[in-house]
Amino acid sequence: MSDNQREAGTIILDPTHASFAPEETVHDLGATHFIGIGGAGMSVLAEMLHEQGVEVDGSDREPSAKTDRLQSLGITVEFGQQAKNVEGKNTVVFSSAIKPDNPEIVAAHEAGERIVHRSDILALLMNAKRAVTVAGAHGKTTTSSMLAHILVNAGEGELADPSYAIGGSIQGKDGAILDGGHAGKGNVLVAEADESDGSFAKYHPQIAIITNSEADHLDHYGTQDNYRAAFVDHAGHATKAVIMCGDDEGNLAVLRALDATVAGRTIVYSTRNAAELGDLNGATLVRIESESETAESGAEHFTLHIPGGLIGEEERRIAVTLTVPGIHNARNASAAIIAAALLGMDVERASAAVTSFLGAARRFQVRGTVSQVTVVDDYAHHPTEIAALLDAARRRYPQSKIRVIFQPHLFSRTRFFSSEFAQALAKADDVIVTGIFPAREKQEDFPDVTPATIVDEALKLEHEPAKDWIRGVEDMHTAAQMMVMRAHHGDVIFTVGAGDITQMDEVILHALEAHRWDCEG
């Protein structure tokens, strides 16, 4: 058992503690058990270890699509977490959602089994590959999915058949949903680097992409300064290059805090020019130039201006077309294309490959259309993500009324960002805020936080119409039915949030079918 998990006889679970010696590999793990194996970040790692021949099993509270997939691969999954599940295991893996009093943690502790955080497993996998990490408050899954897509579809030689560990699923070329984990035979690993618990401090990638460092997860970091300091530290661990978005003020603060050596190998991508950005601390600028004000055709067009000396002696202008709309996706694609070029892929080949990217699951995912009312699902759960989503919606559907059912994620986040959520949601025409998805929190600890926390802030804003554009409805099934009754021909309904609001898509589509003639009125 790791030293950080023994303290005066108690069990300490510290996600920031590194549990493995530098020379250890995944083949030193022995029989490995994942607690909460159906979680997005856990199932990916379990599958990757399984593909590499490690004996893997796990447990979870209930069946899910993730556990179904793992079982189809031959991985044993027990439902219900109990001591017997870890008998005879060498390594037990936990995530930050697991508490020290979990019966499997207690049993593993008593048996002297090695207990490690999921980030320790990912760090082991990285050490054997040319790793590219993607960190940031928003855009991690989409950016890492784009890079994996480029490598899968255009990689040759050592860049072919990459490994990837992505928290969400990916839409393949044919629209099929692919799992976010794969242990490839190539020498590249693309991984999301989750900053929420500080565990990304363990990673030492060749290339570190930082999409943004807007304050989030202050329940862990305490202050914005501490949060950004973690990104400064993470950037310093990249051995070859750092790729950062310059459109985020938090990132610019991180950039200016880097030491000269790290800043000198940093590439900034931005829709702004050098004069607008100001001091870049010696970093190289790649500028993004958008080609149009809308993406009504369904495509996003932009040009990358790559200075000479970065990937060749001559300055390059690379035209890029995306299937997924939004300036935020142009930024995400720029990071992925630059990373692919730094890995050794021809930049034109990389930009051509990203054109066929259909999106990560639950990122502007069109779920269906009935009576010309389109239903779109998105994972956005932070005000900046919601604002970017609704900006993209306006570009993609400039003539449509945009209706949103938003399920807040975490009581603490809802309270802290209530005003910012209201301002972001004001970009829509019609909004219903549902009950809050608690995740790891408990309602009794936040008795004053309800849908009205956001609605009350929103009603202070100037908005047309002034009174009835937003309302709170605790039950999401009721919210879905209400939104269907309000919808008309040509509208777009978005289900938004990181919780189980995605389940309402089918409910909405079936209700639209039942009210087909009303929608056409």
Curated annotation (Swiss-Prot):
It comes from the Bacteria. Pathway: Cell wall biogenesis; peptidoglycan biosynthesis. It catalyses: UDP-N-acetyl-alpha-D-muramate + L-alanine + ATP = UDP-N-acetyl-alpha-D-muramoyl-L-alanine + ADP + phosphate + H(+). One of its GO terms (cellular component) is cytoplasm. One of its GO terms (biological process) is peptidoglycan biosynthetic process. Its EC number is 6.3.2.8. ATP binds at G136, A137, H138, G139, K140, T141, T142. Keywords: ATP-binding, Cell cycle, Cell division, Cell shape, Cell wall biogenesis/degradation, Cytoplasm, Ligase, Nucleotide-binding, Peptidoglycan synthesis. It is found in: Cytoplasm. SUPFAM superfamilies: MurCD N-terminal domain (SSF51984), MurD-like peptide ligases, catalytic domain (SSF53623), MurD-like peptide ligases, peptide-binding domain (SSF53244). GO terms for molecular function: ATP binding; UDP-N-acetylmuramate-L-alanine ligase activity. NCBIfam families: murC. HAMAP family: MurC. Cell wall formation. Belongs to the MurCDEF family. This is UDP-N-acetylmuramate--L-alanine ligase. It comes from Bifidobacterium adolescentis (strain ATCC 15703 / DSM 20083 / NCTC 11814 / E194a). The lineage of its organism: Bacteria, Bacillati, Actinomycetota, Actinomycetes, Bifidobacteriales. The gene is murC.
